[in-house]
């Protein structure tokens, strides 16, 4: 028996937006290269990284190596994940399908079994002659990737996981009492932790080893490197804390729960509450708040984790340069979703707000996004975040256009010279190779307008979609990560250059169906007048015309 069709939300909402001149239809095809001039791919995926980076205008965070990459890339200022939680987001952008197609909203199913035998980005490159390799956290481990990181479909070799991963959530954090705890805040002396190393350090070492191996390979490579930090716990070398004195750390600009926020939209950050140092604060559920001094410490450790991550990225990029691979390797850098640092009185991800769904995204294409270096010069020399001289960086190319992570699949294929997978039909459960995202090559302006006019469109017509499930209309213990069978409400969200519109509707998990006549709550925020999304005007009568045009 064929599976039931997916919820019609995106088809219906897109149709409504088309009538209002908000929707764009883009198709593209790419000419294939011969094997001799094929470009390699380095895909760097970070866990829980919001765009708190120097290259995104953050004046506090020290990220000189990522900033350097951005200076040679096209940087997307407005890139959004399709669901702000690890496994669903990664499966979505690695297959090029939205969560309503993968049917993964939690961590407990494998898309090839429960939805469709969908091809992945690395699988497509593997089938086109690439050696595909995975280091660290690329797919989310466990059931959602078949306890194998989708090997052997996606990878030429079994994926590498650092041996020290198993200590991430154990009692390795030294408290003020001198004992070891499983804390949220966990700056460590690396020499004192089990194995004397950390997972991201091991991933960097393995990535460099593989690059050295591929230097002499006759085949092009696709290397995906997944970093853990700044995912909690904030377990990082303690010296990075010195970059962020507490007296320089401010609270979020909007640290309180907005009065107009529907309860269903709030995430009660239960994973943070489980940590021993947070438990000791005896914070009320669901809204808190966390004491202000501890809020500053959380933000300090998040930023310190980002700078630690930056050094690891810097070592990999420097090695790529030293091996003379930077001239023929496309680099894509992104995150699976963002992370709230106290905005709206929320922490972690698990929502449809920009702070949870907006991600960094940059694409480096050798000789096209930036000139190739002269002989003897390096594109990516390692930059020390502790060196003030590392702060200065040339500005790269930026685009303000709204884009989605689900567009990575067609974009990387096109940039590498492979045929761009066709757009998915509706439904597409029976189609192994297709994509629901756009080809972002148009934003890189690497094409001749006369040859491929359909690659270009009005930036104001672009839209980013995201969604998040809830088990109830009010925050409860499993609101952040409900299992499929517990989902009762789905929040579907549209982000345009002008507004974010979210509608929370009834959802039947047994049929994977949303009921758009059963509206539980709504949100409407105007970007220009309310960039932090604190003033929900969904119930204001003056916006009734806009809401009527948006409702399916």
From Swiss-Prot:
Active site: 86, 140
Record field: catalytic activity: Hydrolysis of the 2-sulfate groups of the L-iduronate 2-sulfate units of dermatan sulfate, heparan sulfate and heparin
Cofactor binding note of this UniProt entry: Binds 1 Ca(2+) ion per subunit.
Predominant location category: other
Post-translational modification: Synthesized as a 75-kDa precursor form in the endoplasmic reticulum (ER), and then processed by proteolytic cleavage through various intermediates to yield a 55-kDa mature form, with the release of an 18 kDa polypeptide.
Disulfide cysteine pairs (residue numbers): 173-186, 424-434
A Pfam family reported for this protein in Swiss-Prot or TrEMBL: Sulfatase
Segment forming the signal sequence: 1-29
Expression sites (tissue/organ): Found to be expressed in alpha and beta pancreatic cells.
Induction context: By glucose, in a dose dependent manner.
Cofactor: Ca(2+)
Gene Ontology MF annotations: calcium ion binding; iduronate-2-sulfatase activity; sulfuric ester hydrolase activity
UniProt record similarity statement: Belongs to the sulfatase family.
Protein name (database record): Iduronate 2-sulfatase
Chain's gene name: Ids
């Amino acid at each position: 028996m064929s599976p039931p069709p997916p919820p019609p939300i995106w088809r219906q909402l897109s149709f409504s937006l088309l009538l209002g001149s908000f929707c764009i239809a883009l198709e593209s095809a790419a000419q294939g290269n011969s094997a001799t001039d094929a470009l390699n791919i380095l895909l760097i995926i970070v866990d829980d990284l919001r765009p708190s980076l120097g290259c995104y205008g953050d004046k506090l965070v020290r990220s000189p190596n990522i900033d350097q990459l951005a200076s040679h890339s096209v940087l997307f200022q407005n890139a959004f994940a399709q669901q702000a939680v690890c496994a669903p987001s990664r499966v979505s952008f690695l297959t090029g399908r939205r969560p309503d197609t993968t049917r993964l909203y939690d961590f407990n199913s494998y898309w090839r079994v429960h939805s469709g035998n969908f091809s992945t980005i690395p699988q497509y490159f593997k089938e086109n002659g690439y050696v595909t390799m995975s280091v660290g956290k690329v797919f989310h481990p466990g059931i959602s990737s078949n306890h194998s990181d989708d090997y052997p479909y996606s990878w030429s070799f079994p994926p590498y996981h650092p041996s020290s991963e198993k200590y991430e959530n154990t009692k390795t954090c030294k408290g003020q009492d001198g004992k070891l705890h499983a804390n949220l805040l966990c700056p460590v002396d690396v020499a004192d932790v089990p194995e004397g190393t950390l997972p991201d350090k091991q991933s960097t070492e393995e990535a460099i080893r593989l690059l050295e191996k591929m230097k002499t390979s006759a085949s092009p490579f696709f290397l995906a490197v997944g970093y853990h930090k700044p995912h909690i716990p904030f377990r990082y070398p303690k010296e990075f804390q010195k970059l962020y004195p507490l007296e320089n750390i401010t609270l979020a600009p909007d640290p309180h729960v907005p009065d107009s926020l529907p309860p269903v939209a709030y995430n009660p950050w239960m994973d943070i509450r489980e940590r021993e140092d947070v438990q000791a604060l005896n914070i009320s559920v669901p809204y808190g708040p966390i004491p202000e001094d501890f809020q500053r410490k959380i933000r300090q450790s998040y930023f310190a984790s980002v700078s630690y991550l930056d050094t690891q990225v810097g070592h990999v990029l420097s090695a790529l340069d030293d091996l003379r691979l930077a001239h023929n390797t496309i680099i894509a850098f992104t995150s699976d979703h963002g992370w709230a640092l106290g905005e709206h009185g929320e922490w972690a991800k698990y929502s449809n707000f920009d702070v949870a769904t907006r991600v960094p995204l940059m694409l480096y294409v050798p000789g096209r996004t930036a000139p190739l270096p002269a002989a003897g010069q390096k594109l990516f020399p390692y930059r020390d975040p502790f060196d003030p001289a590392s702060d200065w960086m040339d500005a790269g190319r930026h685009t303000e256009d709204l884009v989605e992570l689900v567009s990575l699949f067609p974009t990387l294929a096109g940039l590498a010279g492979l045929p761009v997978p066709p757009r998915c039909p509706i439904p597409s459960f029976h189609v192994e190779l297709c994509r629901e995202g756009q080809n972002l090559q148009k934003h890189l302006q690497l094409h001749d307008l006369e040859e491929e006019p359909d690659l270009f469109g009005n930036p104001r017509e672009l839209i980013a979609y995201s969604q998040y499930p809830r088990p109830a209309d009010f925050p409860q213990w499993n609101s952040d990560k409900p299992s499929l069978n517990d989902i009762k409400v789905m929040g579907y969200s549209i982000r345009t250059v002008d507004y974010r519109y979210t509608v929370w509707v009834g959802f039947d998990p047994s049929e994977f169906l949303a009921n758009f006549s059963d509206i539980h709550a709504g949100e409407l925020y105007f970007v220009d007048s309310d960039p932090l999304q604190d003033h929900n005007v969904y119930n204001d009568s003056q916006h009734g015309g806009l809401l009527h045009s948006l409702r399916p």
